[in-house]
């Protein structure tokens, strides 16, 4: 119920318009020495203009690259100092390892959801809640498919209404141990603007596995893999 309520509120807020968004993206591409593909550009623009967005894609499709782009552009467009950026942007993940990876790629602090909500181990309660909400304005959650419905509900309770929320993950990943296939369910609800990343970039030792997974996902498996 809390999740549905928050989605409804965010969808009814006025969208943000940035006059210089296209120019700023081109400048960022130069600065980072990269060229975003069409899906990535769509993901970045949607995240900055919509109030709630889902970005989904398999391993190696550039989700972390997009998160870095969103945070940099948000800082530039809102003229935030590094200190202000750490106060306005919250990068969250279900595990410490995923949070560390987020922090390393963006140069911003990242937290596990439990830490962000100030979980009290003794009482099993969150100090950040509907009565004492978090102050951040841009919240990006990575590995969303790993979060169960109860934890996401608690997180949504602790967030203010006038925010931008970006849910990132792989909807084909194994679901959370707890209840609900939350990312898949949210995508299937069609209530949230969703951008799907289709291009595979990462080609390391696991490139065969990634390519195979991608072909199975897209139902384009060729005889070369059999």
Residue positions per predicted region:
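Conserved P-loop NTPase motor core of helicases/translocases
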Residues: 78-93, 97-158, 199-200, 209-210, ...
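Pre-Walker A (Motif I) flank of P-loop NTPase domains
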Residues: 49-55
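Walker A (P-loop) phosphate-binding loop of P-loop NTPases
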Residues: 60
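Hydrophobic positions on the alpha1 helix immediately C-terminal to the Walker A/P-loop
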Residues: 66, 70
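N-terminal pre-P-loop "Q-motif" helix
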Residues: 33-49
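Interdomain "pre-motor" coupling segment immediately N-terminal to P-loop NTPase/helicase cores
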Residues: 1-21
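Conserved lysine of the Walker
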Residues: 63
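Conserved helicase motor core of P-loop NTPases
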Residues: 171-226
């Amino acid at each position: 119920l809390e999740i549905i309520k928050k989605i409804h509120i965010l969808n009814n807020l006025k969208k943000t318009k940035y006059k210089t968004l296209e120019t700023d993206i081109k400048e960022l591409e130069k600065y980072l020495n990269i060229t975003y593909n069409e899906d990535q550009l769509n993901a970045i623009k949607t995240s900055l203009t919509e109030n709630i967005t889902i970005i989904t894609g398999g391993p190696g499709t550039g989700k972390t690259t997009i998160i870095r782009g969103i945070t940099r552009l948000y800082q530039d467009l809102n003229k935030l100092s590094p200190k202000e950026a750490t106060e306005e942007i919250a990068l969250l993940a279900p595990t410490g390892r995923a949070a560390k990876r987020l922090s390393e790629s963006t140069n911003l602090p990242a937290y596990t959801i439990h830490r962000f909500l100030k979980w009290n181990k003794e009482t099993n309660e969150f100090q950040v809640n509907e009565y004492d909400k978090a102050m951040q304005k841009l919240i990006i959650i990575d590995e969303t498919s790993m979060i169960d419905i109860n934890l996401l509900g608690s997180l949504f309770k602790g967030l203010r209404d006038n925010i931008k929320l970006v849910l990132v993950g792989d909807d084909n990943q194994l679901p959370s141990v707890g209840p609900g296939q939350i990312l898949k369910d949210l995508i299937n609800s069609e209530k949230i603007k969703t951008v799907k990343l289709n291009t595979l970039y990462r080609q390391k030792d696991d490139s065969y596995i990634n390519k195979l997974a991608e072909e199975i996902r897209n139902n384009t498996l060729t005889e070369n893999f059999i």
